[in-house]
């Protein structure tokens, strides 16, 4: 299992939101590329970038920053999410050196788009499923649907998605601990690798996820915890490597 630092981009800066609210953001750095360097130096094996403006605009807004980070680390897998709603955007990011593109809202609203993307760019597509009480949320978490996250996971696994980033939005940015039960349920439902996200606060969460990693949990995304110091990235990754 790899521990993946999140770099959330808003207006060209690296920020962190609480429960996905744009107005409730904390700026951690106005130099996202320097932030990326910091995490790489601490042993990051992949970076998770989110274009927050893009998620709300429905198209890339912080693309230049993403391109700069990808260029600086050509051998480091980078995944990007936020505002990815067309094959053109996916191609744009892959051409810029990004490894994986995360489809979020569009995957839920137009599931057939996921199949098209997987056919066009095999091995590069991740779906981001954000759920609250087991039901999928969309549009920067503004809307909660009547669709069960586990049902979609099965469908996307069949479409050829590489991994699913599963976020429990009730816990994201709240430092309450990760929802291990829901994450395992997702991995079992789709029989597809799951990257856990939302609520990862300290080493207890990393240990808890590692204990069930054999269920198909391949990664853990962490944001606020590593920025505020309740989790040490290097220590967390070293623990996972040693298991």
From Swiss-Prot:
Pathway(s) where this gene product acts: Amino-acid biosynthesis; L-histidine biosynthesis; L-histidine from 5-phospho-alpha-D-ribose 1-diphosphate: step 4/9
Coiled coil: none
Keywords: Amino-acid biosynthesis, Cytoplasm, Histidine biosynthesis, Isomerase
UniProt GO cellular component terms: cytoplasm
Residues annotated as signal peptide: none
InterPro entries the UniProt entry points to: Aldolase_TIM (IPR013785), His_biosynth (IPR006062), HisA_bact_arch (IPR006063), Isoase_HisA-like (IPR044524), Isoase_HisA-like_bact (IPR023016), RibuloseP-bd_barrel (IPR011060)
Catalytic activities: 1-(5-phospho-beta-D-ribosyl)-5-[(5-phospho-beta-D-ribosylamino)methylideneamino]imidazole-4-carboxamide = 5-[(5-phospho-1-deoxy-D-ribulos-1-ylimino)methylamino]-1-(5-phospho-beta-D-ribosyl)imidazole-4-carboxamide
Protein name: 1-(5-phosphoribosyl)-5-[(5-phosphoribosylamino)methylideneamino] imidazole-4-carboxamide isomerase
UniProt source species: Saccharophagus degradans (strain 2-40 / ATCC 43961 / DSM 17024)
